[in-house]
Structures are given as structure tokens and as C-alpha cells.
Amino acid sequence: MTSILIYCPNPTPRHDYIFELFFRMLLGVDYSYTPNVNEAMVNYSHKKNESFHIVPYGLLDEFSIRTDILDEISFETSKMITAFFKTVGGSCQFDLFSAAFFLVSRYEEYLPFSLDNHRRFPAEASVLFKNNMLEEPLINQWAIFIRQELTTNFEISFPKMKFTYLSTIDIDQAWKYKYKGIIRNILGLVRDVIRVNISEIRERIQVFLGIISDPYFNFKWQNEFHLSLKTQVIYFILLGKYGSYDKNIKPSNPHFISLIKDLDSLSYARLGIHPSYVSNSNPIQLSKEYQNLNTIISGSITMSRQHYLIHAMPYTYRQLIKLGIKEDFTLGYSTHIGFRAGIASSFYWFDLTENIKTDLLLTPFCIMDITPMYYRSETPEIAKKTIESLLNKVQAVDGTFVSLWHNESLSETDRWKGWRSVYVHLNKLANDIIFSE
């Protein structure tokens, strides 16, 4: 394996973390430090030489969290790349390593900000949104720039990195009507009558008479479709108690248990826990849901995604690590498409308050079903164009395109009529890209 020699006089845990991200994870090569600046391929110091030189901004030398750092962020474009933390005298006019660290560490989410109505960090508060960069996989672009600079100046080769696609599906409600109990169904029917929702009343009655299938229970169609394209899927299962934001049926329901076991047996699918809305502030409830799922599958779940994408730095990730979770898929926005951490690849979580890299792998998603349908008010046909644009950007940097859907959004009912075709379109496009490379 190719190894990149880096001159960095006093490497810290932040240096180690970001060099591993760029060279091992994004570029597929190894790296090591050299005490001799003249033999370095990458010079990350204030000394000048003929190698690829990035002048440090200073963020990686620090050990604390600075509350004034947002005032220092200004995006500019130089040598066809857009970045921040501008420096003078190097091969690149920015400290890309510090900029990348700021983004993937989610530095800004440790700073004071106004929570949204679900106690989340809002997209509008992010530096990427404020600078119209949210829809760009910047760090992947910077990695390609570094690769080009190194291959120009040195006789080294990099392995070919490939575009990958992953479909993730949250099961918030496995059934729309069935197995929810008499009381919930009566209350639902009363609500529909009060709202004069004739279509819901008709659909509910038809489901219970066996005339039509429950629209949310579309897993047979999903299975046939995913098998036809050999799509890799992760299902995240909500097992929380019934509440204002947790609407699934009881985890003890035998039909629900049977569904979970069926999904776990699929060759192309993996399962993860979908911690309930209330569990984010209740570690006992979180542990109970996790153990319930482990018991059902007679195994050990290692993946998660927070319900409603609720997570707080660093509390939520620390709780997941204690639980035994190895990979989390929460990072993204429901209100906006794009790259919350400025990257279209998985990366390890760096705990800023402890100033250490952890073993928790974060896999961000770039589009969620509700975003084009509700927040962008797009038709299915326009949403397909939106997805194509994002796919092209991820393909261009050999990244990983992760989408977030629900069995509800594949139901072809109510507000989701026509949206199954969007999911089909996305998966076929991604499949074409994979098999064309």
C-alpha cells in the first residue's frame, strides 16, 4: 500500500484523526510522519519546501472548544476549490485539514445555538447552509484535490475508489391500521369522521374487511424490488412505547416480531435500532428498546438511527457507545437535502470535549423522503431531478449516497401517492452507476 510521508512537527489527536480520514478512509492509502521536512510529500507546517504544502491555521493544535470560532469562518474559492480557514504561503490557500476537522467533528453543534421544535440543531444554523455549500460534498472534493496535487508532484499511485449506494428504511409504523388495538382504531376512525376524511374512512374499513392490504405493510413489494436490483438495505426498527411521536405497535405483538425476524433473514438486509423519541433523554428506556430487539433476533444489534433524528453532542453518541452501537446513521437534516458534515462518506466520531477519536462510525445520509415532498414542496417528477443532481455530485467524488425512506413513504397512499416511483428511480439510477464503473 502506498504510504504518504507527512511532516507535522507536533501531531495531536486531531492531526491523527484528520490524516486518517483523508488518506486512509477517503484516498485508500497509508500515511506516516517524518521528522525531515525535505523528504515529506505533505508538509503541514510553517516551514517552506517543495512538497505539497498546507500552512496550518491552528485548529488542530488546540485542545479546547472555542466559542468565537464562527467569526473566523469565511468561504472563498481558489484553485477551483471552495473552502475556509484561509492561510498564506502554501500550495493551497486554505488549511483544508482544519476546515475538514471543523465540519466532521460537528464543532458548531457544541456551540450555543437555537434549538428547533424537536430540540435539534437546525440546518439554518450551519455554516454550510449560510454559505450555500450544504449540497456540496466538500471534504470529498478536497480529498480529490490533494490526490491530484500529490500525483502531479510525486511518482505515487492511489487506488481507484468507487461510488457506493445504500438504502436505509425506518419502520416507524409497520402497519397503518392493523394490530394497533381497538381503542387506537376507534379513536382513529372518530378523528377521520370529524375531519370528514372520506378516503381514510374507506381505506380503514377496506383493510379490516380484507378487501385491500394495509398500505404501510408493503414489505413483499420491497423484497421483490430490492432483490431485482441486489440493493443493500438497512431497516431501522422503532420499538418505543406509544406516545405523541412514537406510533408503532407493541414490540410484544407476534405479528411485529414475525416481521422483524423475516427482515433479519433477508440476504441483502441488515437491521438497526431506531431509538424512540423519548429514549434520547431516557437511557433506561433506550437500553430496554435495544435489548428487546436483540432478544427478538437472537443477536446483537450494532447500528442505529435516532427517531426524528434527535441527537445532542456529545451526549447521544456517548450513550450509543455505552449501549454497544458501532455505527450510527442519524447525521443529516429532515428539512434540507445535502451533507450535514460536508462529506459523502462514513467517518469516525471525534469527541470534542474529550479530544479523542472514538470507534463509533458515522454514516451520513444526504436525502430523506420527507424533504422533497414536504419541505421543498416538490412533485415526484421534480424530486427525481433533485435526486439526480445529488447522485451526480456523489458519483463525481466516489462517495457513498445514503437515502432515508420509510415504509409509509412507499405506501402509495395519501400524501405519498406517486412517491414509490421516486424510490424506484433513485435505486435504478444508483444501480446503473455501480454497474457502469
Give each language-model segment a name.
Residues 1-254, 345, 352-437:
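Terminal accessory/targeting
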Residues 37, 277-356, 414-416:
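Catalytic domains of cell-wall/extracellular-matrix polysaccharide-remodeling enzymes
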Residues 170, 274, 320:
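Conserved hydrophobic/aromatic pocket- or pore-lining residues that grip, position, or stack substrates
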Residues 272-274, 330-332, 404-408:
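Short acidic/histidine-rich active-site segments
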Residues 271-272, 336-340, 399:
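Glycine-centered flexibility motif
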Residues 173-177, 198-200, 223-311:
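Metal-dependent polysaccharide deacetylase catalytic core of the NodB/CE4 family, i.e.
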